[in-house]
Amino acid sequence: MFVHPLNVAISDSQNKYQYVVCKHTISVFAGEKLVGYWVDTDQRDSHNSYKKLKSNAGDAKPKGSQGIGAPAVYSYIRNLRLTSDEGKLIACVDSDKSVVIFKIDTSAEDPEKFLQVMKRQQFPKRPNALALADEDTTIIVADKFGDVYKLKIDEEPIRKIDDQSEPILGHVSMLTDVAVAKDANNKSYIITTDRDEHIKISHYPQTFIVDKWLFGHKEFVSSVDLPKWQTKFLFSAGGDKEIFAWNWQSGELLSQYSFEDAVKPFINDQHLAPARFQNEENNVIEYAVASIKSCGQQPYVAFFVEATPVLFILHCNTETGELSLAQQVEFKHNVVSISSNGKSEYLVTFDNRDENAEQLIAFLTYSGDSNKPFSVDENLNKLNSSWISTFKQKDELLADADSVYPLYNIASLKKHGEHFS
């Protein structure tokens, strides 16, 4: 048995507290010390609760598992987000299709009181992404089936959201990411992306008014990012073999960076297309960018291709938007998630499904060296041993090779012929 990989990791702006998701739990560390711990007690029993699908004969049958030997249903916690005052934490929870808002009590001595549930709002469909608006008083929630809702943080939960609150905008396909931006005149916009190669920019709160579309992607868009160091820029990535840099305010595509050659040495059998989409030689490869994140204070943007052990870091010209490869950082294990904070640090989590794995997370700090702008912080890296020791004391966080939650779901967003018929 080993500690399950960390699905998500973020920190506050100064990296005093680290918030990490492991399966259906959220742990909060202050360096080596576990100061907060929350377990989703509403999680479903994945071994006994199966979704039903209708067979051609009309009989109900259990839905197949997501992987060999894996349970059919997984209670993910995803999309951790801190409010700008860092007093609240927001998470999307799969077990009951909800958004959970926590009040953070840094004075709490009991780890179970550090994160206090303020509100738990269920949605008709699984929340897929979230952003903050209205000076962090409103959460913008995008769901799996293409609808976007707004949720007031301080209001009571709505019993039946479909009856009392309608979507503020929508797409015809699965939403993959959402962001909120302001232009030079302080007007707000919602930026949404989907499985159909679309980036849509809508006025907010008048979301029925579409400001523009950003056209250029030929495959699905999985991730967008708005850098703090140039507020008119937007970065996007997904199923294409390029990273896109936009001026979202004018709608101009500023540049594209092709990573096809750079990632080629890291492509392996995990990137083979599903059997039903293979050719006779069985060599059709499919891969996608799982996440793209700009650096907090410096003009860099990092991304990784799903199921690879390398992080690519691009430099961005803040005047022209031109992207160029500044560095690639290789690790022992595949990257699972990345995030950045206000100290120009990246937090990187790994697929450490190895009995002897000693690294759950790495911290990359900005060095200022133009030839190697980021380096692994060895002092922070020492936190791995203390975190692993803490997690090993909690049985719910241990796993074996057959019980790891599916970590690689992005490439499956790619559309094939059956999706267009």
Curated annotation (Swiss-Prot):
InterPro entries: Trm82 (IPR028884), WD40/YVTN_repeat-like_dom_sf (IPR015943), WD40_repeat_dom_sf (IPR036322), WD40_rpt (IPR001680). It comes from the Eukaryota. The keyword Ribosomal protein does not apply. Pathway: tRNA modification; N(7)-methylguanine-tRNA biosynthesis. It is found in: Nucleus. The keyword RNA-binding does not apply. GO terms for molecular function: enzyme activator activity. Its main location: nucleus. One of its GO terms (cellular component) is cytosol. GO terms for biological process: tRNA (guanine-N7)-methylation. Keywords: Nucleus, Repeat, tRNA processing, WD repeat. WD repeats lie at residues 72-112, 170-212, 216-258. Forms a heterodimer with the catalytic subunit TRM8. HAMAP family: TRM82. Required for the formation of N(7)-methylguanine at position 46 (m7G46) in tRNA. In the complex, it is required to stabilize and induce conformational changes of the catalytic subunit. Belongs to the WD repeat TRM82 family. This is tRNA (guanine-N(7)-)-methyltransferase non-catalytic subunit TRM82. The lineage of its organism: Eukaryota, Fungi, Dikarya, Ascomycota, Saccharomycotina. The gene is TRM82.
